[in-house]
Amino acid sequence: MDLVSALSLETWVLLAISLVLLYRYGTRKHELFKKQGIPGPKPLPFLGTVLNYYKGLWKFDMECYKKYGKTWGLFDGQTPLLAVTDPETIKNVLVKECFSVFTNRRDFGPVGIMSKAISISKDDEWKRYRALLSPTFTSGKLKEMFPVIEQYGDILVKYLRQKAKKGKPVTMKDVLGAYSMDVITSTSFGVNVDSLNNPEDPFVEKAKKLLRFDFFDPLLFSVVLFPFLTPVYEMLNICMFPKDSIEFFKKFVDRMKESRLDSKQKHRVDFLQLMMNSHNNSKDKVSHKALSDMEITAQSIIFIFAGYETTSSTLSFTLHSLATHPDIQKKLQDEIDEALPNKAPPTYDTVMEMEYLDMVLNETLRLYPIANRLERVCKKDVELNGVYIPKGSTVMIPSYALHHDPQHWSEPEEFQPERFSKENKGSIDPYVYLPFGNGPRNCLGMRFALMNMKLALTKIMQNFSFQPCKETQIPLKLSRQGLLQPEKPIVLKVVPRDAVITGA
C-alpha cells in the first residue's frame, strides 16, 4: 500500500492546515510595504529577499535603485528594510532623528564582550563611549600619534623598494594590509609588530583570524533569518568573534596596562594610553566616566575590525586608480614634491593640507565605499516620508548606489578627482556622499583613517610610480563579498622614482 492511500483524510487536512500556517508564519510581515505601495523584489517565505545578496550587495542595490526609484522595500528574513535615497530623508535618519528614533545599528548576532565596542553598543552606553573616546581623535592627539605611524610608512617604503628591485609585480592588498595591520595594532595595543617581515607573529595571526568574517557565514545567516536565535546562542556561549582571539587580546591589554602602570617613564601617545588615561583619571572607577578593562579591550579590538579592511582596501583601490590614470598620478606626485622638496619627511600639517591628495582620496572613497550600506534600526513605530515603519525595522541607505547615481555625479563610473576641488566640492550634497556615514553616529575614526591613508600615499608617491601589468584587471571588477572588494587581487608594477630617500 502506498503512502498516499495509507493516510486518512483527517491526516491530509491536518497536514494541509499545517503547511498553510507555516507559510503564513514565514510571510507574516511581507505585506508591510506592498500595502503602502512601496515597490521591491518579491520576498520568499522565511528567507525574504536575502538570496539576492549573492549577487553582491553593491550590485543588488544598484539594480533595485534603477528598477524601483528612490524608495524600495526589502526583507532580511522577516525583518523589513526600507531603502531610502532622498537626501532630506537621509538627513532625518542620520541627524535629525538620530537620538530619538534611529540611534542604533543592527544587531548581527551574539558578540560576547564586543557588545561593549562603540560600533556595536546602543543608546546611553554608546553615548558614553562616544563622549569618552571622541577626545582621542582630536587633531592634537592625532598629531602626537603621527610619528608612531610614520615609522611604518618607512618600513612600507623599504619593503616596496626591495620588491621593485626584483622587478616582479606586487599584490597590493598583501603589502598594504600589513601596513594597515601594523599601524592599527601599534596605536590600539601599543605593540610594535612588523607584519610585513614577520607575518607569522602570534599577534598578527590572532588579528587575521578575527578578520575572517563572511557575510554568508551560517551562524550570521541564521541570525539574519531568525533574530530570536541571538539570545539562544548567547546562552550557549556561542560568539560571532573567535573566542581564542578575543581572549588573547584581553590578556594582552591586561599585560600592557600593568606594564605601563608599573613603569615610571612617560609613555607614547596612542589609543591604548588615551583609553587608560580616561580610566585612571576617573575619581570613581565604576562611574560612567571610566572605561573598564573589558571596555578598553573591546574598543581596541573593534579598531582592528573596523580599520584594517577599510584602510588596506581603500589604499589598494587608490593605487589601481592612479596606475590606470598616469596623468592624475603625476599631478599628485608634483603636489607632494612641491610640498616636501627633496623627499623631506612628511609632517602632520603638510599631509593634511595637500589639496590634490585630499581630492584623490575622496574620489576613491566615492567610487569604492568599502561599506556598501548604512543601516539604522527604528526604536519605535515611526512614519518616514509617509511610510509606516514598525519598531525593530531597519532603514537602509545604499551608499554605493548613491555614489554612482548619475543624477548626483556626472560620469559616475569615471575616476575624476576634480569633483572634490575647492570650486566643486561646495556643490556636493553631504547626504549623497557618505564614505564615513554622517551625523552623531558617523565613523569616529574618520580623521585617523584619513591621516593614516594620506601619510601612506605621501610616502609611497614620494618614492614610487605604479603601472599596470599583465596581471592587472582593467577595468576593475568587484566581488560579491559583503564588504567592497575587487574580484581579483589588485596587482601592479612598482617603479622606483629617480631619487632615493635616505634612511628608508
Curated annotation (Swiss-Prot):
GO terms for cellular component: endoplasmic reticulum membrane. The keyword Coiled coil does not apply. It is a peripheral membrane protein. InterPro entries: Cyt_P450, Cyt_P450_CS, Cyt_P450_E_CYP3A, Cyt_P450_E_grp-II, Cyt_P450_sf, Cytochrome_P450_3A. GO terms for molecular function: heme binding; iron ion binding; monooxygenase activity; oxidoreductase activity, acting on paired donors, with incorporation or reduction of molecular oxygen, reduced flavin or flavoprotein as one donor, and incorporation of one atom of oxygen. It is found in: Endoplasmic reticulum membrane; Microsome membrane. Catalyzes erythromycin N-demethylation, nifedipine oxidation and testosterone 6 beta-hydroxylation. This is Cytochrome P450 3A11. It comes from Mus musculus (Mouse). The gene is Cyp3a11.
